[in-house]
Every structure is written in structure tokens, then in C-alpha cells.
Curated annotation (Swiss-Prot):
Changing F345N: Does not affect binding to N6-methyladenosine (m6A)-containing mRNAs. Residues 221-282, 284-353 form the KH domain. CDD domains: KH_I_FMR1_FXR_rpt1, KH_I_FMR1_FXR_rpt2, KH_I_FMR1_FXR_rpt3, Tudor_Agenet_FMRP-like_rpt1. Residues 1-49, 65-117 form the Agenet-like domain. It comes from Drosophila melanogaster (Fruit fly). It is found in: Cytoplasm, Cytoplasmic ribonucleoprotein granule; Cytoplasm; Perikaryon; Cell projection, Neuron projection. The modification Phosphoserine is found at S403, S408, S409, S413, S532, S533, S539, S541. This is Fragile X messenger ribonucleoprotein 1 homolog. InterPro entries: FMR1, FMR1-like_C_core, FMRP_KH0, KH_dom, KH_dom_type_1, KH_dom_type_1_sf, Tudor_FRM1.
Amino acid sequence: MEDLLVEVRLDNGAYYKGQVTAVADDGIFVDVDGVPESMKYPFVNVRLPPEETVEVAAPIFEEGMEVEVFTRTNDRETCGWWVGIIKMRKAEIYAVAYIGFETSYTEICELGRLRAKNSNPPITAKTFYQFTLPVPEELREEAQKDGIHKEFQRTIDAGVCNYSRDLDALIVISKFEHTQKRASMLKDMHFRNLSQKVMLLKRTEEAARQLETTKLMSRGNYVEEFRVRDDLMGLAIGSHGSNIQAARTVDGVTNIELEEKSCTFKISGETEESVQRARAMLEYAEEFFQVPRELVGKVIGKNGRIIQEIVDKSGVFRIKVSAIAGDDEQDQNIPRELAHVPFVFIGTVESIANAKVLLEYHLSHLKEVEQLRQEKMEIDQQLRAIQESSMGSTQSFPVTRRSERGYSSDIESVRSMRGGGGGQRGRVRGRGGGGPGGGNGLNQRYHNNRRDEDDYNSRGDHQRDQQRGYNDRGGGDNTGSYRGGGGGAGGPGNNRRGGINRRPPRNDQQNGRDYQHHNHTTEEVRETREMSSVERADSNSSYEGSSRRRRRQKNNNGPSNTNGAVANNNNKPQSAQQPQQQQPPAPGNKAALNAGDASKQNSGNANAAGGASKPKDASRNGDKQQAGTQQQQPSQVQQQQAAQQQQPKPRRNKNRSNNHTDQPSGQQQLAENVKKEGLVNGTS
């Protein structure tokens, strides 16, 4: 910069120090002391300062010599070089009279303020050389820094080398002509070195920041250091270091360092809480949880719904179910327990703890539910065992089962009062085929395998009932049934009142064929059945009596099988089942019937009941009535009764004709009509 020093003469005639800032064709821009801004001055007003020489002795000033005095006219002005003549000299004090003023002005000056008159001529256009060097765009920002071109300026002997934003170039000013030539040779090298210098400067600045951070870290009170497993470093760092950047933004965290070789994080912070928060974001781990094998499916859930919910709520990165023991792909590093499957949790330590809490709670719930289910199964087994032991042959049907017809079924309530004679454990209300072999103990209402040909059997056909184990009305058994009546001592006691799959009654042709099935060889069994019907009719309600009487009246014109007639009536429309008006028979017929069958009834009841201990009051009343009316029986009826007893009965079934004899159909029809009339009169 000293090469660009000049002296500029201002309007007052004095020369002032200045520095060249730019060179123009008709002048030069100089920054003069005492002038606010750089201004352009003509070349004639500018000169170079005198050369400074090393003088061995002080200069000798004599009187009358022209000298230049460094002074000023007032205190507000800047000092400049003024021309004067020495008037008097005394030691080192000189009296100088200034030249160029209208009035003479003399001043006493010291030796240090004096110098010899400057003999340099004014400068010209070739005194200073100025040229520009364009700067690459990528280096313009760095070229503006102060002192960055200092070495380049010294090498080319330039007085000044500055970057101009207006020109985007380096402005070089020098007193030497060779400066421009050197600059042309070195500019490429200078700009290449400048780019390297910029990179080094950036590294220097980064190092300075690290130094500052280190100083701040040294002032920090809390430091946490932890290690992350090698295979989990990617999760800890995050995508493009996102996790580390997020941890650095935590309030109070001053520094986070990572040693990649040892996979160690070092966190420094102002408070312990901030350091712990940053550690929770970076510390990834892997832990195992043993789940019972039988609960693995329930823990995972349908389509993985339960395990996915645990992942979402806990924030864990991944839950992996390890391969089951025995598989080829199982990891040997995973600890295993007997009858357990390890679940592998991968994520931050905090998220793994949350996942364990959720999984433990779900497992405790599953175990509790399984325990309740086992208790319920044990109770069900005990209940089933008690029902089987108490119900016996009822096949564990609930005791409290009600009739399917509901409470309002009067017909069902009336029918439930019927039933055969009681056995050892049968109901007293029952009636029907008692004896040693009556009934098989199955309720037809709950069984599907009953035979259609049994739907229309006679109520007193004991031999066939004993063989097949069925009872028409009550069945009977030593155990009985919920709805059934009586039964014998030996049979299981089936109730013929139908079940869920009860078949519809047969047509008239089938019913007509059923009338002909007979297994008894004597008329005594038939008479016993008819007399039992009379006794029961006396003891039933008015509804039962009228219903039975209508069925007897319907059967007066057909074969004399009581149950068959009832079955035929059931198949007819309801309009055809209206009670028919009957002519009351003569009292003699009733008396003859009761007297002729008294002894047969007693013997039939004895055989049917098998020594039953519960006779009915209706049977005793029937015996008294028969004894009273026996004397009034006409002789004609007795003869017909005797003829009927002497003649054999017709065959009921050709396949069972071994124990039966033929009987004319006319006599059989006559005898049955007489008996029916007596039965109807007896029940009216």
C-alpha cells in the first residue's frame, strides 16, 4: 500500500498525504487525509512523496533556505506541507516565513517539523498502472474476504488488489509495468489455489466450531455414554442420521458424539433429564419374552390383529416370533424354555418395556379365561354324571322339561292322569299294560325309531306289548317317565304319546289291516280289556267320559277294536268327528254284560297287574254294580254269551294263525255289537 502514497495539492496551496484508489485516463482517485471521501484529482496536482533516505547526520538548514513545514492554519484543519523561508536559526529553533500569502506570516518551528523542499514533479498517466482480473463465479463469495489475495498481490508487485462487486473482478493497481504481465501468468494458479484455500477455510471453521462445542461440553455437568449392538446401529442412527439430529434438538443437549468403531454414543447436556431423553431416542436393544406354546395363537390373534395392536401402541420397531423348537431355521442365540415360544422385541428400551407390559397383561387375561373355562367344564361333567345316575334309562333328559303344548293344554293334562298299573318305581296315575313284562321304558315323544304298526295297537294286547316293549297309553317301567303312567315290574315303560318326530297316523286301509292282528287265544283277555275300560271310564273326568263315548259311538258300525276305531276317527276331518246321537240300550244288556264278565275281569286284572298293591276304587265300584245287576240278566243274552264263548275267535293275522281257530264273522259281529252297547251304556 506504500507504493500508492501520493501528495495532493489542495486549493490553499499546501500538499496533503493521500492514497491512490483508482486510476482514470484524465486523473487519479485519491483518498486524502481530512477529506471525507475519495475524489478525483488532476495529474498536475498530484506528486509522489520524496524518497526517504537514511541520513547519518541531521540536515543542515541555513538562513534563506526554502523548506517545507508540516503545519496547519487552525486547529480544525489537517496538517499539510507548507512552503516557507528560514529567516533566523538559533540552535534547533527556526523562524520561518510562509510564502504565497498576501501578508507575511512568520512562525517559530522545531527542527522535526521541517524537511527539504520536495522536488518530485507531478505524476502522469503512466505513473500508475491499473487492470482487472475476472473472478470465477464459484469463488466470488470467497474473493470478497479481506487479505485473501495478499500473497498474490505481493508476488506481482501490486500496490493494491481488491475485489469489486460491481465488476465481479479483481482490481490491481501498481507503479510497475511488469505487474500486469505477472498477474496474467499467475491468475489461473491463483484461482485454483483460492478454491483449495476456501476448502481449508471451511474445515478450519468447522474445527473452530468443534472446539467451541468441546469447550461447552467441558462446561456441561451431565454426560451419558452407552453402547448399541452392531446390527442395531442402523436403527439407532436413523435414515440419513435423522435420529441423531432429532436427539440434538432436545432442549439442554449440548453435544452428541458417536464412535463408529465401538458403536458407542456419548451424550452431553446441561441437565440430567435432557440427557436421558436423548438417550431414550438413540438406545436400541433386543429382548426376549417367553410365551406358552398353547397361547401363541391367541397372542398373535386373527390375522395378527392382537400383536399388531401391541406394536402400534408400544412404539416398538418389530416383534418377531422365533422359530419353534425343532425347526432348521431357529436361531441358536435365542434362549428357549420348555413348552414356550420366544417372542423377540426390537426397538428402543422404552418401547420394549411398553410392549412387555401389554403382552403380560394380555397373557394374564388369557390364562384367567382358560382357568374359568376349565372350571366350567368340570362343573358340566359333574352335572352330567349326576343326571345320568339319577335319571337312569331316561337318557339324561332334563327333569324339568315341560310339555311342548304348554300349560293351557287340558287334553294333555287329562291324558297325563291315565296310565297303567304301577310297578316298583312307576307312577300311580298310570294305567295300561302292567305285569311282569309291560313296556320297554322308552318315551315315544323323544325317540324316532318306533314302528308304525304299533301306533294303533289295542290297549290291552299284553302279549304283544310284552314282546315289543310298548304300552299304548302309559307304558310303564320300574323307573317311569316324566309324563307317562304306570308300567310293570320288568319293562322299561315307554310312553306312546309321541315325540318330536312322531309320524302321522296311517290311512284307513292300514288301520283296517291293523284290526286283524291278534295274539291271544282266548276271549278272556278281550273281556278283561273291555271291563277295564268300563272301570276307567267311571273314574275319568266328564271330558274324558264324553270323549271316550264319542269314540265308542263312531265304532258301532265297524270292527270292534277300540283303539283301531279311535285311530280311524283321528284320520277323519273334524266335522266328521261330531258326537252321534245313540239310542240307550236296555238295562238288561248292560246287566248281562257286567255279570258275564265279572269273573273274567278279576282274573285279567290279576294277570295284568302282576300282584299290584294299589287297586283302584273304580274297580270295587264296578264289582258291586255287576253283582247287583246279575240277577236281572235275561236268559236270551246269557245264551248268546255262552255261544260266543264256545266258538273260537277269528284270526287277526294270517302270519300268527298257529294259536287261533276260525269263527264265523256274523257271530263275531253280533257279539261285539252287544258288548259295545253295554260299554257305552255303562259309561254314560
